[in-house]
Amino acid sequence: MGLWKSSPFLAFSILVLCQAGGLQAAPFRSALEGLPDPTALSEKEGRLLLAALVKAYVQRKNELEQEQEQETEGSSLDSSRAKRCSNLSTCVLGTYSKDLNNFHTFSGIGFGAETPGKKRDIASGLERGR
């Protein structure tokens, strides 16, 4: 992770140092080294490379920030529960009470005195028995 953060900065620093070396007032090069280096970048190429490096750095930084925001959004949903569940027994009790409440409010269970079909079946069974 640290490599991704430092590599664009390192490349940017190298490019700046190369450009600064070419702009020195008293160059270290001798007269024999006056021949142009085929691997040296022209000014236009250097600027394009610098712009591309800065663009890649900004894009990567934005991607990392978006990933961190998504992680914090996902954890913020459970943050209130995490604050409430500082004690394990409180957390377990809250979870069980929530599940118990959901169980009692679920109307799809087909048994008990509250079930409409059962009352009719019991009443018709009593009438048949007489």
Swiss-Prot record:
InterPro entries: Calcitonin, Calcitonin-like, Calcitonin/adrenomedullin, Calcitonin_CS, Calcitonin_peptide-like. It comes from the Eukaryota. GO terms for molecular function: hormone activity. The modification Phosphoserine is found at residue 42. The modification Proline amide is found at residue 116. Synthesized by C-cells of the thyroid gland. The lineage of its organism: Eukaryota, Metazoa, Chordata, Craniata, Vertebrata. It is found in: Secreted. GO terms for cellular component: extracellular region. Residues 26-82, 121-130 form a propeptide. Keywords: Amidation, Cleavage on pair of basic residues, Disulfide bond, Hormone, Phosphoprotein, Secreted, Signal. Belongs to the calcitonin family. Residues 1-25 form the signal peptide. The gene is CALCA. Coiled coil: none annotated. Disulfide bonds join 85-91. Calcitonin is a peptide hormone that causes a rapid but short-lived drop in the level of calcium and phosphate in blood by promoting the incorporation of those ions in the bones. Calcitonin function is mediated by the calcitonin receptor/CALCR and the CALCR-RAMP2 (AMYR2) receptor complex. Residues 62-84 are annotated as: Disordered. This is Calcitonin.
